[in-house]
C-alpha cells in the first residue's frame, strides 16, 4: 500500500482531512498520463428497458477507525482517509455540486468549474421549484481563469483551500488539462485529496496508464461514494428510494418498444445539428436510459459534415419524432430564440418533431440526485405526454415550469425534507 507520505516532502497544512491509501499503484498518481476519448457516436442500436437502466442498489460503506477518522474507497483515487467530514469542498461539475446540496452540505462548496452563470443556471432551473433548497453560486470561487474557461489555475486551488476536490485526477493528467504528476500530487498533499470519476460519464477509457486501476460506475453508484465522503448514507438511501420509485412508475407505463417515438438528442446552432448517442453507456444518459428509446440517427443514411454534424436537409431525412436540445434548460432566451428559428424553417413541416412542435429543452447529463429526479420527470412528459401528462413548455426559461401537484411524478416536499435532514 502506498501511503500519501510517499508523495510529499512535508506534512500537509490540513490536519483534519488527509489523503491516504492505494492510488493507481505506487505514488499518488503513478503513471496516470496520456489521453482518453469519451466522444460519443451515433451508430448504436436502441437500448432495451430491460438492460442497464436498472442500477444495483449497492452500498458504499466508509471504514471508521478508533480515533473517529474514516476512509472511502473509489476508483481511480483508491482509499481516501478523512479525519473529519469535509467542511470545504470544490465541486467542479454539477454532479458533485448537486450531490453536496442534496446531502445537506451545500454550504461546504467553495468553488465550481467553468462559467459560473451557466453552472448556476444549470442547477437553479430545478432548485427554483423546491421550497427552501438554494444554491448560492454567485459568490463562489472558480478554478478556471476568466480568460480561459477551458484551463485550470493551480494557484486558485490553494486560494480556495478546500478539504476535498471532487475532480478525477486522471482527467487532470489527460490532454484536456495536461497536468504533470507532481502538479496533481502537490494539490492533494498541500490542500486536500482528489475524489472523482470523470470517465464513467460515458464509460470511456481514461489515459492509458490509469486503465489498470480504473472502474466505471453508474450514476447512483457514483453518488453513493460522494455521500460516503460526507457520511450521509441515510440521505443517499432516501434519495435512491425516490429515484427507484420514479423509474419503476415510468417503466410500468411505457408503451411497447415498437410504439415509442424515434428520438434525436442534439446541440444546434444556426441550422446545424450535432447529434449525441444517448444509447451509449455512462451516467451522462441516466435521465434517458430508462425509456429505452430508439436513436433516430442510428437508422439514417443521411450524410454528416466533416465535424459529424447534420444540416437541416439531413434532419428531414432522419425524420425524428422528438428532438431534445441537450442542456437546453440552462440556455434561457437563447433556447427560445433558437427554437423559434428552427421551427420557422421552410423545411420544418418535413421533420415530424418540428412539424408537431416536439422540440424541447433537455437537461445536463452531469446530474446529481435532485437534477436526476427532475430530468426523469421532464423527459417522461416530453416523450409520452399521453401517459405522464403534458410538458407545460419552457415557461420563462429561468425555472422548471409549474406542474400541477396531481401530475407530478415525484414528491417535491419529500425532496426538501431529505435535504433538510427530515427523513
Predicted regions and their residues:
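Extracytoplasmic substrate-binding proteins
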Residues: 180-271, 362-423
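Sec-exported extracytoplasmic/periplasmic mature domains
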Residues: 94-95, 101-105, 159-162, 170-171, ...
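Short helix-initiation/N-cap motifs at beta->coil->alpha
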Residues: 75-77, 140-154, 301-312
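Solvent-exposed loop/turn segments at secondary-structure junctions
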Residues: 94-98, 115-118, 165, 170-175, ...
Amino acid at each position: 500500500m502506498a501511503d500519501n507520505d510517499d508523495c510529499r516532502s512535508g506534512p500537509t497544512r490540513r490536519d483534519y482531512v488527509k489523503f491516504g491509501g492505494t492510488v493507481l499503484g505506487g505514488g499518488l498518481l503513478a503513471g496516470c498520463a496520456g489521453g482518453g476519448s469519451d466522444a460519443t457516436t451515433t451508430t448504436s442500436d436502441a437500448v432495451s428497458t430491460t438492460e442497464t437502466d436498472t442500477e444495483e442498489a449497492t452500498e458504499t460503506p466508509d471504514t471508521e477507525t478508533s480515533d473517529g477518522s474514516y476512509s472511502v474507497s473509489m476508483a481511480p483515487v483508491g482509499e481516501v482517509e478523512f479525519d473529519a467530514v469535509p467542511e470545504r469542498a470544490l465541486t467542479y461539475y454539477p454532479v458533485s455540486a448537486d450531490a453536496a446540496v442534496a446531502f445537506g452540505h451545500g454550504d461546504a462548496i467553495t468553488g465550481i468549474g467553468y462559467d459560473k452563470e451557466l453552472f448556476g443556471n444549470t442547477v437553479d432551473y430545478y432548485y427554483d421549484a423546491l421550497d427552501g433548497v438554494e444554491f448560492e453560486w454567485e459568490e463562489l470561487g472558480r478554478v478556471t481563469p476568466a480568460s480561459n474557461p477551458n484551463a485550470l489555475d493551480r494557484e486558485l486551488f490553494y486560494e480556495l483551500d478546500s478539504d476535498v476536490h471532487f475532480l478525477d485526477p486522471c482527467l487532470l493528467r489527460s490532454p484536456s488539462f495536461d497536468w504533470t504528476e507532481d502538479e496533481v500530487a502537490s494539490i492533494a498533499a498541500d490542500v486536500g485529496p482528489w475524489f472523482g470519476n470523470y470517465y464513467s460519464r460515458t464509460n470511456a477509457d481514461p489515459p492509458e496508464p490509469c486503465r489498470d486501476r480504473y472502474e466505471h460506475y453508474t450514476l447512483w453508484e457514483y453518488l453513493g461514494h460522494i455521500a460516503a465522503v460526507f457520511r450521509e448514507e441515510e440521505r443517499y438511501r432516501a434519495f435512491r428510494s425516490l429515484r427507484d420509485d420514479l423509474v419503476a412508475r415510468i417503466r410500468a407505463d411505457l408503451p411497447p418498444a415498437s410504439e415509442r417515438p424515434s428520438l434525436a438528442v442534439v446541440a444546434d446552432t444556426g441550422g446545424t445539428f450535432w447529434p449525441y448517442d444517448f444509447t451509449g453507456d455512462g451516467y451522462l444518459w441516466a435521465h434517458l436510459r430508462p425509456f429505452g428509446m430508439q436513436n433516430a440517427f442510428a437508422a439514417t443514411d443521411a450524410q454528416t459534415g466533416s465535424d459529424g454534424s447534420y444540416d437541416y436537409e439531413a434532419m428531414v431525412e432522419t425524420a425524428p419524432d422528438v428532438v431534445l436540445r441537450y442542456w437546453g434548460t440552462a440556455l434561457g432566451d437563447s433556447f427560445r430564440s433558437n427554437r423559434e428559428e428552427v421551427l420557422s424553417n421552410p423545411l420544418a413541416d418535413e421533420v415530424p418533431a418540428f412539424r408537431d412542435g416536439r422540440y424541447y429543452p433537455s437537461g445536463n447529463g452531469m446530474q446529481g440526485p435532485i437534477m436526476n429526479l427532475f430530468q426523469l420527470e421532464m423527459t417522461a412528459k416530453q416523450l409520452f405526454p399521453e401517459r405522464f401528462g403534458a410538458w407545460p413548455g419552457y415557461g420563462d426559461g429561468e425555472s422548471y415550469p409549474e406542474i400541477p401537484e396531481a401530475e407530478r411524478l415525484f414528491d417535491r416536499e419529500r425532496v426538501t425534507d431529505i435535504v433538510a435532514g427530515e427523513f
